[in-house]
Amino acid sequence: MTVQRFIEYTPFDSNGQQLPGESRKITLNVLLEDSGNYLIHRDILRHQLSQKQGTVSTKTRSEVRGGGKKPWRQKGTGRARAGSSRSPLWKGGGVIFGPKPKTANLKLNKKERNLALQTLLYNKRDIITQVSTLDIKNVKTKEFYNFCKEKGFNLNEKLLVIDSEKTTPLKLSTRNLKNVELISASNLNTLSLLKAKKILVTTSALNDIKEIYCG
C-alpha cells in the first residue's frame, strides 16, 4: 500500500545561515514498512548485480592447450590409466565447474525503482541537510573538510553528498576523503542512500530529485 508523505527543508548558505525563502517541499509516495523494505532490498540487489563485470573465466580440459596425446598406454605400466595430460586431476589441467562469463541481472521496472528510492528517502529524512550550493572554487580537500566540520558532520561516518552534477573542483576536493561519497542527483541509488549516516544535498539537486523520481 502506498501513502503520500511530505518532507520540507530550509537550506543553509555557505556561512551557516538559514535561508527560509529557499525552503523546498517534496511529496513522496511511500510504501508501508514490510512492502517498502522488500522493494528496497530488491532494488539494492538489482543495483549490486548491475555493477558486476561478469568477465571472470577459467578453461575446461577441452580449452587448455595440449594434452592430445595419451600419456602412456592403457595397460601394463602399473600406473593409473590416463587419457590426457590436461585432465582436471593433473597440474596444468583444466578446471572443473569453474566460473564462466555471464550476465546476472534483476529486472525492476521504473515505477518500482522510484518507489523504493522515495521510501528510503523518507526513512532517511532526519539525517538530510540541505545547502543552497556547494560552490567549491579551489581544488582543496582541506577546504571541503573544514566546510563539513563547520556544518557538524562527523567524517568518521559515511557522508553522502548529492549535487545536481559532479563538478570537477568538487569531485577532486572529495575524492581523498574515504567516508565521503559524491553522487549526482540523476545517479542517485538506494545502496548509496542506505549506507549513508548523513546526507548533504544542494537545492538544485533536491529540485532534480523531485523532477526525476517524484514526478
From Swiss-Prot:
It comes from the Eukaryota. One of its GO terms (molecular function) is rRNA binding. Pfam families: Ribosomal_L4. It is found in: Plastid, Chloroplast. The keyword Acyltransferase does not apply. One of its GO terms (cellular component) is ribonucleoprotein complex. SUPFAM superfamilies: Ribosomal protein L4. Coiled coil: none annotated. Keywords: Chloroplast, Plastid, Ribonucleoprotein, Ribosomal protein, RNA-binding, rRNA-binding. GO terms for biological process: translation. Residues 67-78 have a biased composition (Basic residues). Residues 51-87 are annotated as: Disordered. Part of the 50S ribosomal subunit. Probably binds the 23S rRNA. NCBIfam families: rplD_bact. Belongs to the universal ribosomal protein uL4 family. This is Large ribosomal subunit protein uL4c. It comes from Thalassiosira pseudonana (Marine diatom). The gene is rpl4.
